Amino acid sequence: MLEKFKANILFRQLLKRPNIDKAYAMVKPTDSWYDTITKVHNSLAEIHRLPHEILEITSHDNLRLKGIYYPSANKGGVTVICIHGYTSHAERESAFPGLFYHSLGYNVLIPYLRAHGPSEGKYIAFGSLESMD
């Protein structure tokens, strides 16, 4: 019985959809991370001002997965895909590098992996399913 309880806690902590907004709300202006989070927030506002499109695909297991595409002024060209980390918010994590690559003339795609942001999915699969998306 105890093993089932431990397994259930482990499952919920690792695989369930995270509550990112709650985590960001816990940072205080006195924390060492405050300056970094302020820079990320400013880059997020800046990237939102760029022309962009919301893209959506249907995964092999019928989940609607979304992303944001920022085309460069150069038509065509290379697209950089900025992938967020485990339990991260795609735009918050990718705005800073996305702006950097966009300023160099690249198209930028910021996808929301399954079970993150507006993409559907109840569980994070650590790449085992995402690799087919």
Outline where the language-model segments fall.
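An N-terminal hydrophobic leader/cap segment in hydrolases
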Residues: 1-57
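Short, flexible hinge/linker loops that cap or flank conserved catalytic cores
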Residues: 48, 73-75
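A short loop-to-beta-strand scaffold at the N-terminal edge of the catalytic core in hydrolase folds
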Residues: 60-71
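Histidine-centered divalent metal-coordination motifs
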Residues: 66, 84-85, 116
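Short beta-strand element of the alpha/beta-hydrolase
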Residues: 77-85
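The serine-hydrolase catalytic nucleophile loop
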Residues: 86-100, 113
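Catalytic nucleophile-loop/oxyanion-hole region of alpha/beta-hydrolase
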Residues: 90, 116-133
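Conserved alpha/beta-hydrolase
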Residues: 100-120
